[in-house]
C-alpha cells in the first residue's frame, strides 16, 4: 500500500508553494482568496479559461505550467459548475480529481478551499481532503521494478487553505479515520492469497486492539465445539485452518444491544470439488471482500470513538479441492442445528455466513445486523458493478441503507425476499440445499441466510460487483475498492450512535 500523501490545513493568508489549485464556477469566476493568490497572473489565467474548452464545468480541470506573474510553479483550476447544483458528495470527487492531476508530484501543493460565492465549509473541506487521500492510494508493494508509464504514486505535501483551520481539522478528524478504514479494506482485498490466508487475516484483524477493539479468535477446535459444521465443511479441504474473528467496540451505553456486521472471508475460492474454470480464478483472492470491509469499518468506528456498541464478525476459510474436501452430496449440520445438503461446493460463502450469523444472533442479540459478501455472480448479472444487492427482512433498515448509499455514492438496490422462493432450496434429504439452481441465484442465497438470523432486523449486501474489479472512479483507482466502509460508517453515524 502506498499512502504517502500528507494533507493538512492552513489559513487563506498562507503563501502558496509548488502547485496551486483553485476553483471556479461555470461563469469562470474565482473567489476572493483565489483571486488574491493569482495576483498578477489573473489576466493570463482568464485568457486561458476563456480560450480553452475548460468552461468551468463540474470536475473539469485546466492545467497551466508556470503562468506569468504567479509565484507557484504550476496552476490547476478545477471547475465547480453551477453553485445551485453542488452536492455534498461533489467535494469528495473534487479531491479525487485534483489528486489525479497532481499524481507524481513530489513537491508542495496548496489547495484554496473556496468557491466563488464563499469559502468551503469545514465539512466540504474535510471531504476534499478525504478525496485526495482515497485517490492517492496505490497498492504496489510487490513491484520491484517500475516501468515508464506506470501510474505513479502521490508523495506530495498537500496543504488546504481554509477560512477556519480549527473547524476544518475538527471536521476532518473522523473522516480521516474512515479513510484509514477504507485503506485497510483495500489492502486486505489486494493482498495475494499465499500471503493472506485465514490465520494471517485473523492476525491482521487483531491489530485493531491498538485502537481499542476487543478481539476473540475462534480456532477449529473452538468452532467444532460450537457446532459450526457449515463453516468448517468449507475449509476442510485446505491445509490452512479456518478461523472466525469477533471484534467488539463498546462506545455506547453499557448494556445497550450492539449493531452487528458480519463478513464473508473466503481467502481464496477455487470452487472446491465443483472447481471453477481457470480463466479469472486469480480474482478469487478477493472473495473475502466482505470480511475486509468489516475489519475496515470496525477500525473506523473505534478510531473515531463512535458512540455506539458494535460487533464485527468474520468467517475466514479457504475453499480448496484436496482429498479431504467437501463433496457434492454431503450433508452438514450448522451451528443452528439445521442441516444443509451440498449441491455445489462453489456455493460456499452462504455456508460460512450461516454459522457466523447464527453465532452473532444468539451471543450478542444485536439491534440490527448487516452482512456483506462477494456472494454471487448472479447479482452482477442483475445489477452490474454500480450497485450492491440489498436483501432485508426489515423495511426501515432497507430504507436507511438506501439513503446513506445515495449520500456516500456506495449505492445499493433492494432485491426481493419472499416465501415463494424457499421451495427452490428445498432438499429431499436435508432441511435445505445450498443452491437453488440457475434462476434467482442471488435471491435463493439470501433466502438461505435469512434462516439463520431469527427475527433480528437484518440486511444482506451482495457486493460481488462492487468490492473488487469495479470500474475505476475519481476516488478509487485500486482493484480492491473498500466498498461498504463509508456506507456502513454513515449508517451508524446517522441512525445508531448515541446522541450526547
From Swiss-Prot:
Pfam families, per the entry: Peptidase_M17, Peptidase_M17_N
Localization of this protein: Cytoplasm
Residues holding Mn(2+) 2: 264, 269, 287, 348
Catalytic activities: Release of an N-terminal amino acid, Xaa-|-Yaa-, in which Xaa is preferably Leu, but may be other amino acids including Pro although not Arg or Lys, and Yaa may be Pro. Amino acid amides and methyl esters are also readily hydrolyzed, but rates on arylamides are exceedingly low; Release of an N-terminal amino acid, preferentially leucine, but not glutamic or aspartic acids
EC number per UniProt: 3.4.11.1, 3.4.11.10
GO CC annotations, alphabetized: cytoplasm
Cofactor binding note of this UniProt entry: Binds 2 manganese ions per subunit.
Binding locations of Mn(2+) 1: 269, 346, 348
UniProt-listed GO biological process terms: proteolysis
Cofactor: Mn(2+)
Keywords (A to Z) from UniProt: Aminopeptidase, Cytoplasm, Hydrolase, Manganese, Metal-binding, Protease
Residues forming the catalytic site: 276, 350
Gene3D superfamilies: Leucine Aminopeptidase, subunit E, domain 1, Zn peptidases
Family to which this protein belongs: Belongs to the peptidase M17 family.
Known function: Presumably involved in the processing and regular turnover of intracellular proteins. Catalyzes the removal of unsubstituted N-terminal amino acids from various peptides.
Stated name of the protein: Probable cytosol aminopeptidase
Amino acid at each position: 500500500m502506498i499512502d504517502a500523501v500528507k494533507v493538512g490545513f492552513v489559513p487563506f493568508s498562507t503563501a502558496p508553494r509548488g502547485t496551486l489549485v483553485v476553483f471556479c464556477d461555470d461563469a469562470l469566476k474565482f473567489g476572493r482568496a483565489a483571486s488574491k493568490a493569482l495576483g498578477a497572473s489573473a489576466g493570463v489565467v482568464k485568457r486561458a479559461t476563456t480560450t480553452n474548452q475548460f468552461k468551468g464545468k463540474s470536475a473539469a480541470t485546466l492545467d497551466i505550467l508556470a503562468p506569468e506573474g504567479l509565484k507557484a510553479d504550476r496552476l490547476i483550476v478545477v471547475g465547480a459548475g453551477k453553485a445551485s447544483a453542488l452536492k455534498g458528495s461533489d467535494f469528495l470527487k473534487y479531491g479525487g480529481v485534483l489528486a489525479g492531476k497532481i499524481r507524481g508530484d513530489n513537491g508542495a501543493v496548496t489547495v484554496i478551499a473556496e468557491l466563488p460565492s464563499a469559502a468551503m465549509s469545514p465539512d466540504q473541506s474535510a471531504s476534499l481532503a478525504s478525496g485526495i487521500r482515497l485517490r492517492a492510494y496505490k497498492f504496489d508493494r510487490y513491484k520491484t521494478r517500475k516501468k515508464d508509464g506506470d501510474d505513479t504514486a502521490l508523495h506530495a505535501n498537500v496543504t488546504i487553505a481554509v477560512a477556519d483551520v480549527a473547524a476544518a481539522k475538527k471536521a476532518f478528524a473522523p473522516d480521516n479515520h474512515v479513510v484509514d478504514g477504507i485503506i485497510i479494506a483495500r489492502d486486505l482485498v489486494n493482498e495475494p492469497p499465499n500471503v493472506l490466508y485465514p490465520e494471517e487475516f485473523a492476525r491482521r484483524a487483531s491489530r485493531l486492539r491498538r485502537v481499542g477493539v476487543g478481539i476473540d479468535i475462534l480456532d477449529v477446535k473452538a468452532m467444532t465445539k460450537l457446532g459450526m459444521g457449515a463453516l468448517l465443511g468449507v475449509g476442510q479441504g485446505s491445509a490452512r485452518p479456518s478461523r472466525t474473528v469477533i471484534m467488539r467496540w463498546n462506545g455506547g451505553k453499557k448494556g445497550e444491544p450492539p449493531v452487528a456486521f458480519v463478513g464473508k472471508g473466503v481467502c481464496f475460492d477455487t470452487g472446491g470439488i465443483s472447481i471453477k474454470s481457470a480463466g479469472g480464478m486469480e480474482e478469487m483472492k478477493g472473495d473475502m471482500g466482505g470480511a475486509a470491509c468489516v475489519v475496515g469499518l470496525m477500525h473506523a468506528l473505534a478510531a473515531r470513538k463512535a458512540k455506539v456498541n458494535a460487533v464485527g464478525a468474520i468467517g475466514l476459510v479457504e475453499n480448496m479441492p484436496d482429498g479431504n474436501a467437501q463433496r457434492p452430496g454431503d450433508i452438514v449440520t450448522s451451528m443452528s442445528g439445521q442441516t444443509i445438503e451440498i449441491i455445489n461446493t462453489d456455493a460456499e460463502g452462504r455456508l460460512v455466513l450461516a454459522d457466523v450469523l447464527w453465532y452473532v444472533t444468539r451471543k450478542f442479540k444485536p439491534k440490527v445486523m448487516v452482512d456483506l459478501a462477494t456472494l454471487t455472480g448472479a447479482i452482477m448479472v442483475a445489477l452490474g458493478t454500480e450497485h450492491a444487492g440489498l436483501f432485508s427482512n426489515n423495511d426501515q433498515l432497507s430504507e436507511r441503507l438506501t439513503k446513506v448509499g445515495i449520500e456516500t455514492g456506495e449505492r445499493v438496490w433492494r432485491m426481493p425476499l419472499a416465501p415463494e422462493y424457499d421451495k427452490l432450496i428445498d432438499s429431499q434429504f436435508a432441511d435445505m440445499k445450498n443452491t437453488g439452481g440457475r434462476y434467482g441465484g442471488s435471491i435463493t442465497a439470501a433466502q438461505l441466510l435469512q434462516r439463520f438470523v431469527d427475527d433480528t432486523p437484518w440486511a444482506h449486501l451482495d457486493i460481488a460487483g462492487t468490492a473488487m474489479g469495479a470500474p475505476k472512479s475519481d476516488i478509487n483507482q485500486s482493484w480492491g475498492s473498500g466498498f461498504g466502509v463509508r456506507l456502513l460508517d454513515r449508517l451508524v453515524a446517522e441512525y445508531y450512535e448515541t446522541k450526547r
